[in-house]
Amino acid sequence: MISGRRIRLYRQRLGMTQEVLAGLADVSPSWLSQVERGVRAPDSLRCLIPVAEVLGVDPMDLIEAPRTRVREQTGTLDGVREVVSALRRDPWRVVGAEPDLQRLARQIGEAEALRRQCRYSELGPLLARLIADAETAVRAHQSTEREVAAFTWLSHTYQTAVYTLFRAGEGHSITWIAAERCAAAARRTGDPVVQALGARSRAYVLSHAGWETEAMDTIMAAIDDVAPASTAPVVEPASDPWWSPAPSALMGALFLDAAKAAARGNDRPGVSRMLREAETVAARVPEDGMLFGPANVAAYGVFAAIELGDATEAVRRGTGIDARALLPFKDRPAMLHIDVARGYAAKGSDEAALHRILEAERMAPEMTRQHAIVRELVSAMVRRRESRSATPGLRDLAARIGALG
């Protein structure tokens, strides 16, 4: 069930007409009608927030998780279920042998590498086991000289879980558990960099849930924490730039997070200010494993433009970026293609939008097929094309991602 059908379902349960809902949510009645009929995809989650508030539901309740049969085709469903089950357990009641911290660190690195490649069907079972192992390690090393290391790797494990669950199509409820545990474990380390990484995870969930103000507050506090160390000159990337980034690179990434939260909150001046800050940092920081640099700043500019409703600007920015510059991560170039596709679709250029989505699928098939916005876009394109000539490949794509029904 796509968001339009869910909006209609909740609206009818309340005995509310489209005109009344549109008036209370301050949206166009024609826009609401098109979304409910499935001929137009919501431009962003931000568009659904006022509608959800009137209906008395969470914005994420208006977006269905990926269809089970689609996730079964890639094996994603079983892997994600294992991670969800691991997070539902009481972390202080997990029973297991004490893991070796060096081995645990190496395996967490392997899990993060799988996440960067969007290989969720392989990642799920490994990450579920690592959550239990990291929780066991913390209990085993309490009040010892290795306690900080144990909490550090526990925080990193939860961080990988946060991004994995969202990219694999899970809602924010279970992901919030991982984010809160990530931030709590990070605080136990006393390390400003680890704490800022934990704050990023928490802000990520807040922003996706529509709580942009809280996300921005979390991000700006983290920037303040790492700022004192960020002025040191950077000669070369850190040896482990994802888990131990240079403070200046981390601060730049936080500015990008702030730009994303500002865009979701429709704060155009805030977006411009945060992107300028990120550009300033990117000019003096080498590219690193976090992929903070000019290409990543440019990609966030595309996202911000489409979130702010400027499809033409999103396409203009996006077509000027070589997605390969965002490698070795697979999700980041794939998301660039998806954001550009959103711009093309908003302009009515379905063929160009389809091309970009197919590029995203080629690069990161599991992530693209689970992505709620992709399903919305493809479903709307299919409905628009029912009375016109079919776009080659569109219905095949719709079948693969479960956007036909």
Language model feature labels by segment:
Residues M1-L14:
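A short, Lys/Arg-rich alpha-helix, primarily the initiator
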Residues I7, Q18-A22, L32-E36, L62:
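Conserved hydrophobic/aromatic packing and binding residues within compact polymer-binding modules
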Residues R11, A22, A52:
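The alpha-helix within a helix-turn-helix
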Residues D26, R46-D61:
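DNA major-groove recognition helix of helix-turn-helix/homeodomain DNA-binding modules
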Residues D26-P42, P50, R67:
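Recognition helix of helix-turn-helix/homeodomain-like DNA-binding domains
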Residues G56-R71, V297:
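Short C-terminal boundary/hinge segments that cap the last helix of small helical domains
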Residues E64-V95:
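Short, charged recognition helix plus adjacent turn
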Residues L104-I108, E112-G405:
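Conserved binding/catalytic microenvironments
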